Amino acid sequence: MDKLLERFLNYVSLDTQSKAGVRQVPSTEGQWKLLHLLKEQLEEMGLINVTLSEKGTLMATLPANVPGDIPAIGFISHVDTSPDCSGKNVNPQIVENYRGGDIALGIGDEVLSPVMFPVLHQLLGQTLITTDGKTLLGADDKAGIAEIMTALAVLQQKNIPHGDIRVAFTPDEEVGKGAKHFDVDAFDARWAYTVDGGGVGELEFENFNAASVNIKIVGNNVHPGTAKGVMVNALSLAARIHAEVPADESPEMTEGYEGFYHLASMKGTVERADMHYIIRDFDRKQFEARKRKMMEIAKKVGKGLHPDCYIELVIEDSYYNMREKVVEHPHILDIAQQAMRDCDIEPELKPIRGGTDGAQLSFMGLPCPNLFTGGYNYHGKHEFVILEGMEKAVQVIVRIAELTAQRK
């Protein structure tokens, strides 16, 4: 474990923030730097079949050290950090033996407070790695990368029995492109785990069904003084549309297994307005109902408009709930839960109120639930990770490999 923290600090020093709306994959040059570094490290460790695709997917194999027909399994993390917050010049703070209370982030006004983040009350005595209040930390998902790399080293150094272990590091997960160019056949694993979760013990195999809704509103602009019966204000139509969306089904009003409608952006003038929503729901029928609801709202608001004025709505599915694919292979979850218990961790099965590469990979034929990393408050200045949690994640990865080798 001695190199776990060193690896993590090394990885977060590289700015790998991804960028939405970019055609190329990876979307940023910084991701290539980390991918090339990891490729070099994997080769130095003696892994075989180390490949880096033109779309930035890095794969490698730790060969089995025991004979027999042991299923090849995989571990996957992503190299990019969220576009929501800067990942440049990350300056981590290490708080040893946390004793409670506020933690000053750098020399500014930002603090990490248990008043806002009550989970801190449960972390007394542990080592926290925080930001300096100016950037995100990058534990999502460089904690996962450091944990996988350290687990590979532990498996090698301690000669722990295992089958073929496949690892992959992907780009652009945060902008929804991480799995689109993933070659499942080349990866050649029976199943895999993304290491991209949160607090210790989290095991996730359910995620949102997700869709995006883009609404284009075309109005008619004339001088306000002579507008009666002629002007069609696109902004007013946009306001009417949003007023029809259930206010109590927004992200800030929902939790657990509850779905939502989220107005992510809105811009415009009298003549033209654009709205972007995302729709999320765990239940497939409710998911489809939410999409129908948006179409009904657009029809209702657009009824009776002049032919030159219109509301155009485009709905595009993003990903689906991987639960239906993972539950077909219950041993995948059984092994992960047993591994956690063997490491004195009580598994906490909870839904992902978001998505992971694993969701898309599960529908591409690679069942892929999500393991914890020990990180919290992703995508912002209050992000932090627990060193002891990272160490536990390494132990669980190693134990999963060991338990799989026993399932001959």
From Swiss-Prot:
GO cellular component terms attached to this protein's record: cytosol
PROSITE patterns, alphabetized: ARGE_DAPE_CPG2_1 (PS00758), ARGE_DAPE_CPG2_2 (PS00759)
Keyword line: Aminopeptidase, Cytoplasm, Hydrolase, Metal-binding, Metalloprotease, Protease, Zinc
The reaction(s) this protein catalyses: Release of the N-terminal residue from a tripeptide
InterPro entries found in the cross-reference section: ArgE/DapE_CS, Bact_exopeptidase_dim_dom, Peptidase_M20, Peptidase_M20_dimer, Peptidase_M20B
Cofactors that this protein relies on: Zn(2+)
Catalytic residue positions: D80, E173
Cofactor notes: Binds 2 Zn(2+) ions per subunit.
Annotated positions binding Zn(2+) 1: H78, D140, D196
Record GO biological process: peptide catabolic process; proteolysis
Classification via CDD domains: M20_peptT
The enzyme's E.C. designation: 3.4.11.4
A Pfam cross-reference name: Peptidase_M20
Main location, first listed in the record: cytoplasm
Signal peptide: none
Sites where the protein binds Zn(2+) 2: D140, E174, H379
SUPFAM superfamilies linked: Bacterial exopeptidase dimerisation domain (SSF55031), Zn-dependent exopeptidases (SSF53187)
Localisation: Cytoplasm
Highest taxon of source: Bacteria
Any GO molecular function: metallopeptidase activity
Listed HAMAP family: Aminopeptidase_M20
Reported function: Cleaves the N-terminal amino acid of tripeptides.
Family note: Belongs to the peptidase M20B family.
Protein's name in the database: Peptidase T
